[in-house]
Amino acid sequence: MAKCKRNRNKTKRNFTVKTPTANQNYKDTVFRMLFSDRKNLLSLYNAVNQSDYNNPDDLEIVTLENAIYMGMKNDLAFIMDTNLYLYEHQSTYNPNMPLRDLFYICSEYQKLVDKKSLYSSTLQKIPAPNFIEFYNGSMVAPDCTELRLSSAFEHLSGEPKLELIVTVLNVNVGHNAELMQHCNTLNEYAQYVARVRHYAADMSLDQAVER
């Protein structure tokens, strides 16, 4: 996987507009459909983490009960090796992903931990969170970058006392070759989106999707 670029204080990212653009709904639907399958999701997990797990049942899918309320309908959340992973597909650049993920993870931890146990003298263990965004919008972006919650803090002085980092992986054709090589489903999805974009330049999006 490509090494991510870090930028703690600047909110401006290396994203520039490129045309033509396509409606994001079809991409969201296809991505969610493909990786709701445990086998495909495990393949994606292995590619991202450079691991070689082979039992899809090792994935513990987390139910996103508050996903609709939070506008996070494209999420895939699961626990693997006592770590909690939140995968989100995005067709547009969204600098607010760290804040959205903070709201989600706080809600999820509330479900995982017995509130009464918070008043005990025993340290309550929780899954370590990991936030990954798979970006395939029409704006030019690096292979890998990071969005930080601290970028939203006003008048931040010194190191932030709270941080949340979202790793953004560009999954457009021509990006993250190693990731694509290790997850064939993701590679095929990227090829599909590229074809639709190509056809959409000369016909309606509905026709391009069906072609």
Regions found by a protein language model. Name each.
Residues 2-211:
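Elongated, amphipathic alpha-helical interaction scaffolds
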